[in-house]
């Protein structure tokens, strides 16, 4: 059986996008609901480019939960493994947009339905047809969902699936910063691919110098580190090669989901070029440069539009 599908485990939620930018939440007259959540976004980016993707999560059996399922399915994402519950509601994230497109979040998630997703709900047989498993730190707070991650990661490791981790730090969701750091550093060695941003590097590694940080990132199973720096471009490192792509200036209106689009489009390129887990250590600089260029173009298109999945381009639009 071919290993084709990207699975992502974690949250799917509603991003409430403000109608007015450059102001506080109190000054926003209205919000528009858009489907989001980092794992869902990564599936969306992969699917928009023509790949097979599926989300492993749980939503509330409520209007927002059904909206998410309907819209993800319309994007080509396999939603058949999404569970519904009446024990909690679908998560909401209210977004505040600055004039430059950067954002802050206010979450309604104590707990939300996704955090109640339990290990026994993970169908481990799915990984026989998996290309990659993607996860983030948002769903790794103490909860059944955290344990479900461990079950999925172990099954993916046994099946030969590429495991990708984007810490995607969201400090307001954690009791304290030390708990978040400890959790990320616990899960990081379980991944083959790690994506980290310049805004996260010093918090997680103690240094803002990526070259100095690499020894603390190449731990456990990690073979590829993607380092994104916004307007300053993006880097990719194996233990022996380095790639870089400069960003082209664009007028950003909303950066929501940009990092998710980057990793989703990069994973799509790995799959398109037949890169399996065993091939990661041998990737060359010219390959990395080419794939970084593509993902930068993907993100450049996305940030000029509002929302996350809604803003992602197809291959023809690039």
Regions found by a protein language model. Give the residues of each.
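Glycine-rich phosphate/adenosyl-contacting loop at the front of the ribokinase-like
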Residues: 1-78, 117
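Conserved N-terminal subdomain of the carbohydrate kinase-like
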Residues: 52-135, 318
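Structural alpha-helical scaffold elements that stabilize or flank donor/cofactor-binding regions
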Residues: 125-126, 186-187, 218
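Conserved beta-alpha-beta core of the PfkB/ribokinase-like small-molecule kinase fold
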Residues: 138-215, 232-233
């Amino acid at each position: 059986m071919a290993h084709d599908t990207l699975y992502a485990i974690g949250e799917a939620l509603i991003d409430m996008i403000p109608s007015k930018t450059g102001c506080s939440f109190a000054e926003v007259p209205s919000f528009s609901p858009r489907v989001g959540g980092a794992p869902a976004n990564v599936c969306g980016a992969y699917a928009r480019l023509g790949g097979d993707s599926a989300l492993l999560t749980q939503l509330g059996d409520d209007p927002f939960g059904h909206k998410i399922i309907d819209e993800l399915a319309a994007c080509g994402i396999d939603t058949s493994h999404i569970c519904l519950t009446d024990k909690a509601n679908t998560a909401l994230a209210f977004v505040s947009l600055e004039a430059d497109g950067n954002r802050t979040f206010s979450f309604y998630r104590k707990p939300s339905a996704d955090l109640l997703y339990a290990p026994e709900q993970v169908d481990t047989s799915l990984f026989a047809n998996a290309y990659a498993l993607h996860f983030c730190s948002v769903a790794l707070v103490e909860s059944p969902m955290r344990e479900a991650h461990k079950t999925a990661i172990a099954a993916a490791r046994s099946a030969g699936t590429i495991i990708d981790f984007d810490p995607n730090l969201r400090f307001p969701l954690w009791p304290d910063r030390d708990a978040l750091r400890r959790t990320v550093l616990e899960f990081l060695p379980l991944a083959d691919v790690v994506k980290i941003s310049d805004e996260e590097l010093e918090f997680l590694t103690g240094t803002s110098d990526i070259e100095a940080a690499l020894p603390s990132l190449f731990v456990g199973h990690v073979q590829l580190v993607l380092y994104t720096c916004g307007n300053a471009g993006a880097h990719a490192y194996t233990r022996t090669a380095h790639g870089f792509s400069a960003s082209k200036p664009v007028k950003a209106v909303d950066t929501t989901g940009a990092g998710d689009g980057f990793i989703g489009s990069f994973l799509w390129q790995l799959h398109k070029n037949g890169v399996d887990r065993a091939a990661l250590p041998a990737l060359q600089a010219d390959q990395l440069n080419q794939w970084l260029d593509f993902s930068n173009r993907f993100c450049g298109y996305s940030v000029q539009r509002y929302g996350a999945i809604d803003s992602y381009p197809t291959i023809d639009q690039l």
